[in-house]
Amino acid sequence: MLVIFLGILGLLANQVLGLPTQAGGHLRSTDNPPEEELKYWCTYMESCKFCWECTHGLCKNKVNESMPTIIENSYLTSCEVSRWYNQCTYDEGNGHYHVMDCSDPVPHNRPHRLRMKIYKKEDL
């Protein structure tokens, strides 16, 4: 009974958070999440490369227009994301992971923002 309740709760959480219920709500590890999920994944870990569109070393956030244009550097990380039941995971490589409850997400942006280089016209 508890398992059924938790399963239903997980499916409801996915719908509330805007996550599709593909393959039972699971998402295999990928560095290219579905377009309709970018807003979710990029809100809680905005330094992932898949969240940014870069041209000639300048990068603009794909989902958050209030983010400044940045200079492409080590701020952007090659993340892989996955979802198994209600567990959302960001794999940053080098053994660094951010794991959170999908229905109660916790941003993991601060440590990365320290490396962000905001573009200014004088930089050209």
Curated annotation (Swiss-Prot):
Can you supply one Gene Ontology CC term for this chain's record?
virion component
Q: Signal peptide: which range, if any?
A: 1-28
Is Cell membrane among this UniProt entry's keywords?
Answer: no
The highest taxon in the source lineage is Viruses
Its localization reads: Virion; Host endoplasmic reticulum-Golgi intermediate compartment
| The entry's keywords | Early protein, Glycoprotein, Signal, Virion
Q: Motif span (Prevents secretion from ER)?
A: 121-124
Stated induction or repression of this protein's expression: Expressed in the early phase of the viral replicative cycle.
In terms of Pfam families, this protein maps to:
v110
Q: Which family does it belong to?
A: Belongs to the asfivirus MGF 110 family.
Per its database record, what is this protein's job?
Answer: Causes the redistribution of lumenal ER protein to an enlarged ERGIC compartment.
Q: Indicate what this protein is called per its UniProt record.
A: Protein MGF 110-4L
Source organism (scientific name):
African swine fever virus (isolate Pig/Kenya/KEN-50/1950)
